Regions:
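A short, internal acetyl-CoA/4′-phosphopantetheine-binding micro-motif in the GNAT/acyltransferase core
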Residues: 29-36
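C-terminal structural segments of small proteins and small subunits
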Residues: 47-81
Length: 81
């Protein structure tokens, strides 16, 4: 899942490839320096989690930001693999 500028440059992204049937691994988050500190990573990760839930998948967070995000959002603990 990516946030792009008008020139199609990636300004923020969350990657979550499928690693097992029904399980994705949230393995990478990135936010360009120009957007840091504005809540972009949290917003993008929230959208990724909504997409994962809507697909009926479970998530295995392995990047430090995703691990921290799930700790701060215990209402999504049911999605953890």
């Amino acid at each position: 899942m990516q946030y792009l500028d008008d020139s199609w440059n990636v300004l923020a992204e969350v990657t979550f490839p499928q690693v097992e049937p029904g399980i994705v691994e949230i393995d990478h988050t990135f936010v360009d320096e120009s957007l840091r500190g504005q809540g972009v990573a949290g917003e993008l990760l929230g959208r990724a989690v909504a997409s994962i839930a809507a697909s009926g998948y479970y998530a295995r967070p392995t990047c430090s930001y995703a691990v921290s995000w799930f700790e701060k959002h215990p209402e999504h603990a049911g999605l953890l693999a």
